[in-house]
Amino acid sequence: MAITLNKLYEGVTAGRRKPQGMASIFEAGFKEFIRHKQQPSMETKMDVSDVMEGSRRAMRAAYNRELDDLDAHLPFLASVGSVSPYIGLFGTVWGIMNAFRGLSNVAQATLSLVAPGIAEALVATAIGLFAAIPAVIAYNRFASSVDRLSVRYESFMEEFTNILQRKS
């Protein structure tokens, strides 16, 4: 049983939630297509190329909104991934400074005097890396997913434009 575009459109728009992803792109393109095809009089009807261009523009606008939504939190992950090692480095420098400060107050330096400051420095380094590594991995994964979805959305828009072209 073949599903018509009208039934698919009804299914997409019948939900309580706003469509997302390809459904949003489909809704925008088909809504514009229907609007242009159902012009009331013959004088105001548009030719096929204008109808198709209107549908393409509507799909492109929906596509851009979808990509904006997908990209919204990537800058935060990028910032965490790039800044965290520097915060860890700052903690390392602070810990080493404390270790040297502790040495300056004693006549003879021993490992037991230096070790707490160095341990503090290494903990700060580890915390910075603990935050940075997962953030960079997550950023790369999500950025790659956004790129793949972008290609899929563009392919969908081209294929759907061809379907609408045959319907006009």
State where each predicted segment sits:
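Ser/Thr-centric signal marking residues that sit
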Residues: 79, 92, 125
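Residue-level detector of functionally special positions within alpha-helical transmembrane segments
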Residues: 85-88, 128
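Membrane-embedded alpha-helical transmembrane segments of multi-pass integral membrane proteins
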Residues: 91-94, 98
